[in-house]
């Protein structure tokens, strides 16, 4: 399998918690409705929001563009029935990724979420 690009990101969970609590716009700009619905059922939702934020940033870095030309909500991170995270892309980034497979892993500690 050919590797197109590798992206990584780490973020403090408290930064995402602060952003979410400051304005309701943050969630709508960054996360899809499916992600929000899934995360809000979690025991520790801020860790999940942060993990998905880091994963979205990492996916954008793997394409070599960062978030230029699309929205973070165009990258959706959900979990399959076994809990494994997977990526669904929308709009312009979906076209850019045509034919590619994206592998992700998300880790959390008390303070950080990492992709």
Where are these regions (language model features)?
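Core catalytic alpha/beta fold that binds nucleotide/phospho-ligands
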Residues: 1-115
